[in-house]
From Swiss-Prot:
Subcellular compartments: Secreted
GO BP, sorted A to Z: glucosylceramide catabolic process
Activity versus pH, per record: Optimum pH is 4.0.
A single GO molecular function term of this UniProt record: glucosylceramidase activity
Species annotation: Thermothelomyces thermophilus (strain ATCC 42464 / BCRC 31852 / DSM 1799)
The keyword Glycoprotein is annotated on this UniProt entry: yes
Function: Xylanase exhibiting endo- and exo-xylanase activity. Shows the highest activity toward beechwood glucuronoxylan, which consists of a beta-1,4-linked xylose backbone decorated with the methylated form of D-glucuronic acid (MeGlcA) attached directly to the main chain at xylose C2. Also acts against wheat arabinoxylan, a xylan without MeGlcA substituents along the main chain, but the xylanase activity is about two orders of magnitude lower than that achieved in the case of beechwood xylan. Shows no activity against carob galactomannan, konjac glucomannan, or barley beta-glucan.
Temperature dependence: Optimum temperature is 50 degrees Celsius.
Domain of life: Eukaryota
Name of the protein described by the UniProt record: GH30 family xylanase
Uppermost EC category: hydrolase
Amino acid sequence: MYSLLIALLCAGTAVDAQALQQRQAGTTLTVDLSTTYQRIDGFGTSEAFQRAVQMSRLPEEGQRRALDVLFSTTNGAGLSILRNGIGSSPDMSSDHMVSIAPKSPGSPNNPLIYSWDGSDNKQLWVSQEAVHTYGVKTIYADAWSAPGYMKTNGNDANGGTLCGLSGAQCASGDWRQAYADYLTKYVEFYQESNVTVTHLGFINEPELTTSYASMRFSASQAAEFIRILYPTIQKSNLTYKPTIACCDAEGWNSQAGMLGALSSVNSMFGLVTAHAYTSQPGFSMNTPHPVWMTEAADLQGAWTSAWYSYGGAGEGWTWANNVYNAIVNGNASAYLYWIGAQTGNTNSHMVHIDANAGTVEPSKRLWALGQWSRFVRPGARRVAVSGASGSLRTAAFRNEDGSVAVVVINSGGDAAVNVRLASSSSADQQPASAKAWATDNSRAIEEIQASFADGVATVNVPSRSMTTVVLYPAADA
């Protein structure tokens, strides 16, 4: 018995010595909780344009698998924002999103003729699952266009502008108030279905004309419409008044260019939204509002589930860095990949649905986003972190529960990394334990070893990986 005790003590001493040696040899990252940046609202995706319909056609097991990999915080990416498309089309042909008022009432002075099917192109089902099964609290509803009868071109596709806006006069009259009523009614239908729409957008890529739902708006026209939409929402019977978002421009630079004209209605809208197609996030926008990167994807590449092969546009490694650039360099408060799950063989989505086999295949793009979303939860505050070497990109966040998540993107070889809080941190902020998860060519948010002693977490960060180290306070130890 005595010899066994001695052996165990020696083994423990050897392990402690090994951990100490690794800590002394590694890079030390120091998190300063007193230096704060933006609040993080979350990470997410969309199932617009009938992608939710595709998901609903899976066998029950496939449906659950698709929902799990998107929204579960234990075995999925833990996405916390769902972006829904507000339909404008007269029917569901092709992948069109059907309108909640597909038939013209004949005049903007007549009440709209609503036709709510309790499905919303199956987006309501996905929303209900996200909210009630997985605890998602942020639903962003965004319209690509008004119904065609409200527009200058009489069509919800091919551009056109909302009748009644400055420079957009129509023989049928001024449809601005009708469109505001339409959007508010959509939110009401969701509330009646026990889903709260928290954010509401009225345009998408307003500088672009497409053969599908699209509508042109200038920045001044957007401000003009916000002056109508805001009081409409406030005077409504909605139990929760959604925050107005604007304007989902095609690129970061384009959206930044709209902010001057929007400043006159800063008190009426509360969220700036931008895409990353024509320009990527690379700077902080000059606005008092949080900024979300609400749509980005590799739209052209053939489907790949790879983490890293050659740095291709659809690889998970690329998207780990894209999100980093938006959060750290662009000061974004949220990041959304275009589509979550769908059929087809492009990288426009993160999860591939095989309709014939009834199966789903997550890509490493999903797990890259999940390395953020699983551990940087809504309400987290980005904080300062220092000490990274040339091959490491780092970002740190303090969650509302007191845990601290440190993201490490490693472009070099295996690296011993120590994570600690700055000495200025108060006693109640000090961590009591740590865990780490990594994604690379062989892992998908897989827990890896993290030793913890004297307030310092030590992790061997794999080469060409994204690793998230989480420091837990005593209550979570």
